[in-house]
């Protein structure tokens, strides 16, 4: 959301753009140049975004805190790796106070005909942000507003509602 929409809150807002590469690039640049002169790690990174409903543990129209992150578009099982496991890298990243699993991928999740038991929500940035925070040992919290169940039209209609819920939640914690 735009800076002017969160005035009065003690957080600096950074827009990362859509997708894992944008999220990684923008957050890493922000960390490396935190105060404009030298690297200075933030006390915490808080992510807000929308997500698709992938399990019956979440409901469209609600805001949830996420606790674990996987890459849903990483599949090299043919090479002997577990699904969602990056070869010689990270698999599941744990962090945050929630117990839900967010599956990040660089495509719009369209699973409205069948839910999964493997993860609860799908987005396009959280795993990347959690990975950067893990690399720099920065606490990471992630809040996802369930905007749809794999339906792009639902997403467009519901985005604004999620921002309002998130801002209210942050004001309680400020």
Segment roles from a protein language model:
Residues 1-3:
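N-terminal beta1-alpha1 ligand-phosphate binding loop
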Residues 5-174:
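Glycine-rich phosphate- or other oxyanion-binding loops that anchor nucleotides, phosphorylated ligands
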């Amino acid at each position: 959301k735009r800076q002017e929409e969160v005035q009065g809150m003690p957080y600096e807002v950074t827009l990362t753009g859509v997708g894992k590469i944008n999220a990684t690039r923008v957050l890493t640049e922000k960390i490396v140049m935190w105060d404009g002169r030298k690297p200075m790690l933030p006390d915490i990174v808080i992510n807000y975004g929308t997500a698709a409903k992938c399990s019956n543990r979440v409901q469209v129209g609600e805001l949830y805190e996420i606790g674990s992150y996987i890459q849903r578009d990483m599949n090299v099982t043919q090479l002997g790796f577990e699904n969602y496991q990056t070869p010689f890298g990270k698999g599941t990243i744990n962090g945050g106070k929630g117990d839900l699993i967010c599956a990040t991928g660089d495509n719009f999740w369209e699973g409205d005909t069948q839910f999964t038991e493997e993860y609860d929500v799908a987005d396009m940035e959280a795993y990347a942000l959690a990975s950067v925070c893990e690399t720099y040992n920065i606490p990471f919290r992630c809040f996802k507003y369930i905007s749809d169940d794999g339906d792009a039209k639902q997403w467009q209609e519901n985005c604004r509602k999620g921002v309002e819920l998130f801002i209210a939640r942050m004001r309680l914690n400020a």
